[in-house]
């Protein structure tokens, strides 16, 4: 059973992208990967609808790249493995566009899309504004061989 709003990656795995500033949608995931600042994490976890399911956080400032790129790659790979195994997974940042779109593009790479085509794939299949900055686009192009935030 998939999550409402989930998209299908080229390898058949399903993932839901969303914005944490929006109300939590219907459908409880088995696992969530959340992208944001420590402040955002505190705010989300203080809400009535805070994630009660297994989840991880990546410190990833808005319009930027992850603070610990190698750790982010490990968590993105783990998210993909869970999705391939049939778990209901989601990825989310504040608005659900730039950082979330960047991770969805990285998931597309893991699902077989050439890294040079992954941003276009995410914009076609997830959100037309996915991957908002030039450095996010470069990060996807180098994924999963990313060793730095720059």
PLM features per residue range, with description:
Residues 1-90, 103-150:
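Cys-dependent protein tyrosine phosphatase-like superfamily
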Residues 96:
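Conserved G/P- and acidic residue-centered "switch" motifs that form tight phosphate/ATP-binding loops
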């Amino acid at each position: 059973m998939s999550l409402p709003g989930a998209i299908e990656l080229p390898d058949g795995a399903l993932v839901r992208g969303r914005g944490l500033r929006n109300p939590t949608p219907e459908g409880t995931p088995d696992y969530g990967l959340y992208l944001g600042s420590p402040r955002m994490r505190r705010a989300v976890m203080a809400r009535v609808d805070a994630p009660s399911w297994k989840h991880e956080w990546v410190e990833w400032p808005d319009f930027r790249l992850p603070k610990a790129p190698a750790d982010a790659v490990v968590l993105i790979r783990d998210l993909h493995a869970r999705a391939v195994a049939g778990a209901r997974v989601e990825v989310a940042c504040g608005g659900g566009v730039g950082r979330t779109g960047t991770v969805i593009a990285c998931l597309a790479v893991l699902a077989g899309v050439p890294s040079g085509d992954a941003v276009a794939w995410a914009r076609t299949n997830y959100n037309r504004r996915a991957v908002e900055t030039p450095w996010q686009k470069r990060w996807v192009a180098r994924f999963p061989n990313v060793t730095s935030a720059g």
